[in-house]
Amino acid sequence: MVQEDDENLRNSMSLRPTSLSTRPTSLSVNGNEKTLPEESVLRSLSTGTLKYPDDEHLYTFSSANLQDLGAIGNGNFGTVYKMRHKETGKLIAVKRIRCNNIGHREQIRLLREHDTIVKSEKGPNIVKFYGAIFSEGDCWICMELMDISMDLLYKRVYMVKNSRLNENVVGHITVCTVDALDYLKKELKIIHRDVKPSNILVDGTGAVKLCDFGICGQLEESFAKTHDAGCQPYLAPERITSSDKYDVRSDVWSLGITLYEIATGKFPYQEWNSLFDQIATVVSGDPPILHPDSDDFHYSLPLVKFINTCLTKDRRHRPKYDTLKSFDFYRIYAVAGPEIEEAKRILGVEAIDTRNHPVDHRG
């Protein structure tokens, strides 16, 4: 991050394992943070304990207390493993970060991600932090285990199984993601800045949770400054060319692209060969539009309106989360009922199926 990000982080961050009084303070970031060596920073993340949301007990642990069940992916800064906590039998995700592979810029991102997860303990639809240790030259960050990302799930459904995700499923994903993003904005005063299908995770129960907070931006009077963050294909027009500050509406655009992709099974733009092509398409061209009868499939008017409004090109007319929550499409699926239970059942089945049948969809 640029210097402005570093200052925002230092001014706003006090890293603690959680807000619970039973967990010790592990790190305070202050004006001297930049001078800390990489290993010292990572060591200071260590809690030495595991605390699960549904268990009041605090478990002291080391790497010997965890059974490695294999790598499940690569995240920011390290490899993610599926592990079993031997004392409880609980399955968790463990991100192992090599000290000698991380510099100052990556430290800032790591601290930001860790801080966001810790502070989001009570937040809806956000992956949970359980604890951390320093072992064998690595920092082991223990988190809630999810089964698969929406990126892999929807591609298997559409491209391999030649099927679709029904509108109830899209509605459930929409509500969970909007609620998570709104929590980040209202409670933590940050925007995600990297909303995309691969950062939306699903488990076998149909739970949907947001992850990857390494580039979250601190808001100053509801606006963020830096423009060097986020996945390029999902960036809002104002983040590609403008040097102006931006706000949560840039994440709303990314949400619109994401939901379009999940609902239709395809990315709304043709592949770009250069940044110039992207600028010509996203900044100078018309925004994507979902039609009620696109691809010989009928989409409801509430869904069409929700996605197309997220993709309003002029940021000034693009809604924020409170407005999105007033839309019929959100309100329909924000209320528990048989449609939501069926959506969760379908998502859970597809999540386990995709996890058990990995396919490389790249290209």
UniProtKB/Swiss-Prot annotation:
Compartments, as annotated in UniProt: Cytoplasm
Name the source's superkingdom.
Eukaryota
Q: Where is the composition biased (Low complexity)?
A: 14-28
Please state what is observed when this gene is inactivated. Defective extension of body wall muscle connections or arms towards the ventral nerve cord. Double knockout with madd-3 results in severe muscle arm extension defects.
Which molecular function GO terms apply here?
ATP binding; MAP kinase kinase activity; mitogen-activated protein kinase kinase kinase binding; protein serine kinase activity; protein serine/threonine kinase activity; protein tyrosine kinase activity
Q: Where is the active site?
A: D194
Q: Name one GO cellular component term.
A: cytoplasm
The entry's keywords: ATP-binding, Cytoplasm, Kinase, Nucleotide-binding, Serine/threonine-protein kinase, Transferase
Which family does the entry's similarity section mention?
A: Belongs to the protein kinase superfamily. STE Ser/Thr protein kinase family. MAP kinase kinase subfamily.
The job of this chain, per UniProt, is described as: Activity is required in presynaptic neurons, in a dose-dependent manner, for normal presynaptic development and morphology. Plays a role in the formation of muscle connections, also called muscle arm extensions, between the body wall and the motor axons in the dorsal and ventral cord.
Record protein name field: MAP kinase kinase mkk-4
Q: Which organism is it from?
A: Caenorhabditis elegans
